[in-house]
């Protein structure tokens, strides 16, 4: 069955959820891309969404070390948008959270995508947090780099330095996917291009807070993308869309995209709630011979029930 794939950058609602920019669509029918009409900005008005909706945002390595669509997710963010209250919440899920994986026993929550693609990731997040997910968005390494470069870069206020001697050299196909190089991001106001922004949110070595700090940086970058992309409108989408080829994937259709964009301006700073499951909600330890993050469900469940009713 032919269906449009709306491809996004980290949750783009030009304001919603603080997750970043507009949805950046790439329309594909089967494996063949189609083009967007020049008349797109003049499409008939569409009814804005009235009911709350939840989107699972996924970020993965997409290099030659892995089988396509069977990757571990490096970033998982659950986003809920309530048009009625004009409130949005984004919850960063630790990739090493030790949970039951449907049909696979206990494992890291990031394995859901590896075992079952986007549907597998949705199943494990829904069953773990007792939430309903309406749609998903997946973005690979090169997709994020392209989006940010097309926006002319982003401005980020770096509060803690990032010093990583073991950053993977796997972005380009002509590089060894198993090599490493040094990455250094110093504190202060910084303008980042796509590669620099990716390094900032992907690096996980040399930070005493580990993946928790990386989750905070990912949310920070999405807010920076939102601020940079706030000038975009539907007329810009054809140019943006032409740059992507399977590097961003989603289940959100065109009409729903337009409806979401129509309410984007209703969301801003105080109405955007950011949650990271740092201790005491979680604790680090070992299971099955590997480093994992253990959830404290007595603390997490009330938090999730309140944020994702």
What is each of the regions a protein language model found here?
Residues 1-309:
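Non-catalytic, solvent-exposed segments at the cell envelope interface
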């Amino acid at each position: 069955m032919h269906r449009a794939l709306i491809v996004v950058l980290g949750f783009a609602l030009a304001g919603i959820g603080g997750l970043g920019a507009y949805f950046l669509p790439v329309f594909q029918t089967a494996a063949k891309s189609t083009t967007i009409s020049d008349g797109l900005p003049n499409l008939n008005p569409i009814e804005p969404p009235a009911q709350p909706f939840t989107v699972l945002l996924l970020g993965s390595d997409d290099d030659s070390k892995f089988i396509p669509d069977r990757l571990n997710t490096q970033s998982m963010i659950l986003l809920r948008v309530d048009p009625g209250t004009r409130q949005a919440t984004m919850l960063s899920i630790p990739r090493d959270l030790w949970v039951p994986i449907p049909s696979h026993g206990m494992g890291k929550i990031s394995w859901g995508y590896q075992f079952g693609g986007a549907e597998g990731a949705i199943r494990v997040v829904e069953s773990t947090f007792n939430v309903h997910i309406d749609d998903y968005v997946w973005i690979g390494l090169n997709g994020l780099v392209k989006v940010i470069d097309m926006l002319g870069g982003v401005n980020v206020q770096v509060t803690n330095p990032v010093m990583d001697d073991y950053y993977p050299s796997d972005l380009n196909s002509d590089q060894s996917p198993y090599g490493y190089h040094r990455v250094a991001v110093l504190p202060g106001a910084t303008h980042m291009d796509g590669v620099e922004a990716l390094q900032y949110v992907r690096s996980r070595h040399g930070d005493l807070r580990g993946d928790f700090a990386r989750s905070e940086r990912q949310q920070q970058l999405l807010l920076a993308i939102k601020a940079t992309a706030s000038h975009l409108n539907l007329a810009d989408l054809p140019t943006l869309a032409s740059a992507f080829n399977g590097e961003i994937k989603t289940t959100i259709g065109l009409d729903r995209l337009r409806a979401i964009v129509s309410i984007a301006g209703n969301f801003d700073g105080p109405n955007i709630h950011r949650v990271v499951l740092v201790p005491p909600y979680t604790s680090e330890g070992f299971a099955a011979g590997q480093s994992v993050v253990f959830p404290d469900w007595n603390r997490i469940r009330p938090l999730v029930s309140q944020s994702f009713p």
